[in-house]
């Protein structure tokens, strides 16, 4: 009998440790979920102060000392050092919004953070993550219907309205004081590359933005032609050509190289002279063939294997009064081919007059300091493409102006993709919140709680707009909620006047696609995070 006592004790200890292990295993998903939510909320809180026209800017310093000043959500998150895998999901969320809509990158992250906070409160009440996830999905679908109902159709021929939309996007940027110039520039650029009646998308690659330091942003201009960020090559070569005939080649005007590593051994001066003469004759024949086609402006694609054009060839081209521009990037070939109306040629044997584009004037213009660009104007039969010369007094301003005009272009693209607009100033989010609370009464069980939490979370957008503008957020949101409850669906936070007004009358409007995409993307991201119950390290 005595030996049985230790055995029983051992069995009891094993069963106790087993229960403890089971308890820990049951507790682990909750701790992982909380860890994920805390990490994601930290990212959302980092950019929340940048939301809206009165949002603050962030100074980002890279490892090599480069400094960026911006309040663009996608730029901040893209350059932020993020380690936690769930926090990286919010960075990817911002990128997805940037690709889909081009604007609302800060809004979508703040919205996701608010939904995660709401989900955390629901989890603490014992509601299952799957129930929360499915309820958020149905609430987001209902929110999209509400947005469609409150949206207004847009006529793309109404330039004044399009300018207002672009201005609204630019008002939250560092260069907002130049919105009077950049907004019409963005609208005109998009309208020149689309057919407003038939097109349902905009290829922004057909808008070439050349950034040049010097002067101020006010000196920026939209050019109905091409800008080439290169100088003319060759001493004595022309820098101005009228009635230009433009060729675009993808072959090199330099001595050919053998396909294999062969060696040619030259033993005397006669052989050396013969080799140089052959090289000279080879280059001269190519230049003569280019001249015979009638070409007087030559664009040469950049080559990584050998020189695109060597000094001897440049000398021949200069003698023939042909303007030579080399190092055209491969990804720019399609743009220049379309805008100049010329055909890229891969072999000198196929270079003829049919491949040329025609323009009234090609000239090299100074841009301050040693900077120069090639400007092509008066293009005959131009394709749907335009160029923008963007100026700035320093690198920080220039980069921010580039990001700002990109957002403005994306706003107009959103209108082309989905021809509808919404009032700004947090009006759509508040309208959804008010209507979802009413619709929550028709839901049953835990879904009702989840819909209410979803509605409350969306109110963080107008709350943050008011907070960042120095207003009383509680008073402002309460007043806004009352207005929407009384049917004033276009009322939002007017940060300039400091109180709630009709955003449509104030010309503060935004594309439907931006808000609809933000709600859809944010809810999908939150659902993904809620469904994670463990983090497993992969084998390298």
From Swiss-Prot:
Q: Please give the GO cellular component terms listed in this UniProt entry.
A: chaperonin-containing T-complex
**What GO biological process terms does the UniProt entry carry, in alphabetical order?**
post-embryonic body morphogenesis; protein folding
Give the record's keywords alphabetically: ATP-binding, Chaperone, Cytoplasm, Nucleotide-binding
Tell where it localizes.
Cytoplasm
Biased amino acid composition, Basic and acidic residues:
18-31
Write down a Pfam family by its short name.
Cpn60_TCP1
The answer to whether keyword ATP-binding applies is yes
Q: Which GO terms describe its molecular function?
A: ATP binding; ATP hydrolysis activity; ATP-dependent protein folding chaperone; unfolded protein binding
- Keyword Nucleotide-binding appears in the UniProt entry: yes
Q: What does this protein do?
A: Molecular chaperone; assists the folding of proteins upon ATP hydrolysis. Known to play a role, in vitro, in the folding of actin and tubulin.
Q: What family does the entry list?
A: Belongs to the TCP-1 chaperonin family.
The record's note on quaternary structure and interaction partners says:
Heterooligomeric complex of about 850 to 900 kDa that forms two stacked rings, 12 to 16 nm in diameter.
What is this protein's record name?
A: T-complex protein 1 subunit delta
Q: Which organism is it from?
A: Caenorhabditis elegans
Q: What high-level taxonomic lineage is stated for the organism?
A: Eukaryota, Metazoa, Ecdysozoa, Nematoda, Chromadorea
Give the gene that encodes this protein: cct-4
